[in-house]
C-alpha cells in the first residue's frame, strides 16, 4: 500500500507587513461579529486589504454584520486560502461601517484590491449607489499565526 506521509501543522508568527502580504491575494473570509446577546454571528464574505492596511468588505447596511458592528466594533476575520487545506489566519480588530455617499470612492478602492480595474467606473459607482452598498473596514490590532492544519508537530 502507498500511504502519504502525514502532514504536520504549522503556525508561523508574522509581523503586520507580513500579515498584509499574506492576506492581499486571498479574498475568501469569514467575518465574526457580536450579536446583542453577546453570541457570535459569522458570515462568509469577500474581502481585501486597502492601502492603509485595513481589511475591507462590501455589504449592505441592513445586514446583521453591520447592525452588530454599529453596536460593538469588535470583529474577527478568518482569511482562508483558495485551497481549503491551505494556510489561514485570524485577524481581530475594531470595525467600522462607512455608508453612502462617503462609501462610494471606498467601494471603488475595494473593487480595485479584489478584481483590479473596472471597464466602466461611472457604471460601477451608479450600481453601488443604486444597490445601497456600504463598506466595512477593520483595522488589525491582533492576529494569530498564519497556520495550516495537520498533525501536531513533535
What are these regions (language model features)?
Residues 27-28, 74, 119, 143:
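Generic structural signal for secondary-structure transition and capping sites
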Residues 3-36:
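Short, conserved active-site entrance elements at the starts or edges of catalytic domains
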Residues 19, 65-68, 103-110:
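Amphipathic alpha-helical interface surfaces
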Residues 26-61, 67, 75-79, 88-91:
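Short beta-strand segments
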Residues 23-24, 70-71, 129:
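Alpha-helix boundary recognition
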Residues 81-82, 140:
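Short secondary-structure boundary segments
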Residues 1-14, 87-154:
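Charged, gly/pro-rich active-site loop segments
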Residues 63-65, 84, 152-153:
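Short, surface-exposed beta-strand-loop junctions and turns on beta-sheet-rich folds
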